[in-house]
Amino acid sequence: MPFIAFNKASDPAAPDDLRINTDAVLYIEASRPDLLGETTIHLLGQGTVVHAVTESVGTVVSAMMRSPGSLVGCTRHYLAPQPEGGASTVYIAPANVSYTRPNHPASPDFWVVRFVDGSELRVIAPLPEGL
């Protein structure tokens, strides 16, 4: 279980004060403009609690790719109107996905990704390779 360190988005900032177990990552995405930090990390068993860090989504994804396992990028689906700037790309850890299922006849088509902790995420079809 490899750990990687990031700078938690806080005021005031503190260096390397968030160490996460990469095996516990569900998915990663760029933070919404109304949140602190550049990147939001969703962890296993945390429910709606997220961890915002000051590093860019590219830096966080790159650090995750150096550890065992991989991430799969896809476009998030929103039931509500999309945020300004459009839909975000989410990077999902397939090892923590219990199943995926299509939601037809929704328009546009999307998939429901169910994680091992019972949480769910919707992604726009087609489902990317690796999920």
Each PLM stretch: what is its role?
Residues M1-R19, D23-L131:
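Acidic, Ser/Thr- and proline-rich intrinsically disordered linker/docking segments
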